[in-house]
Amino acid sequence: MFVDEAWGSHFGFHPALPEGALALGADLVISSTHKLGGSLTQSAMLHLAEGPFADRLEPLVDRAFRLVQSTSASALLTASLDLTRRALVTGTDRITGSVEAAEKIRGVVRALGRFGVVGDGFHRFADITAADPLRIALDTRAGGITGHEARRLLFRDHQVMVEVATDAAIVAVVGAGSAPDADRFLEALHRLPAPLDDRTPGSGSRSPGREPLRLPRPGPARLTAREAFLGPARVVRAEEAVGMVSADTLAAYPPGIPNVLPGEVITSEAVEFLRRTAAAPGGHVRGALDPGVSRLRVVAP
């Protein structure tokens, strides 16, 4: 089993954190230590487990690594990886402080009642077995503001930067071993306006844009990704692309997971989702031909 442990390089280094992928039986793990571990950007770790497949995997991994390895390795990146390793191994007390700060934020948010704590609903999903306590996902629409607008105003008015925003939520991340000012964050959060709560008197209707974005269902696959990507293609207006086969991978960010793959039929709900995401503050679509997703590349007939 290969695991992309992008946001879990700190897992397993504190009793309050989930177990790391290696401890759970993974054979090969890529940990993006630059995200939450503390190493410099562009640095990461590749771990090979001492499991039944290790002897077979090691020469294959070594061969693949040498294929892309730089002949001018960065001493700065390597040193930062070693410092990160040491900080995680010896930082139990510091991580305790980080977890306590995150729990304080969630506790106050619950007590005040304006915003929702997304993680409080995780128990309803059997496939969620653990959650990172250092990631604080908050339902901003419950508090009358979109996630994108909340993120923008938190930074503009309070110099508070959250990790990511969606139409309905923000995610604040506490670095493992860091000591955030929880009171400052909570004050800034609860000073946000609530424009979505403004309604026409007597209308009972929601404000424009009140309905949250929902992930589109994937369209049916008509070709393999290889056939669609390498085959002849043409560019059409997004509206015309509905019902045609995509030649590109299109991924709305956040979170950056593909919504349309080469070879899949482009649906109207996918076009709407991609364009609304692109129009939102901080949103963009990877793989799109232009920022507004006005044109799409499709497989030529």
Language model segments and positions:
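Structural motif
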Residues: 1, 27-28, 45, 135, ...
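Conserved PLP-enzyme active-site core in the AAT-like
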Residues: 1-121
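Solvent-exposed alpha-helices and their adjacent loops that cap or buttress functional pockets
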Residues: 20-24, 36-40, 128-130, 163-166, ...
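Short, glycine-/Ser/Thr-/acidic-enriched flexible segments
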Residues: 34-36, 51-53, 83-84, 141-143, ...
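Short acidic (Asp/Glu) and glycine-rich catalytic loops that position anionic groups and cofactors
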Residues: 58-62, 80-88, 129-134, 164-170, ...
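Conserved small-domain helix->loop->beta segment predominantly found in fold-type I
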Residues: 93-170, 176, 197-219
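PLP-dependent enzyme catalytic core of the Aspartate aminotransferase-like
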Residues: 153-157, 163-301
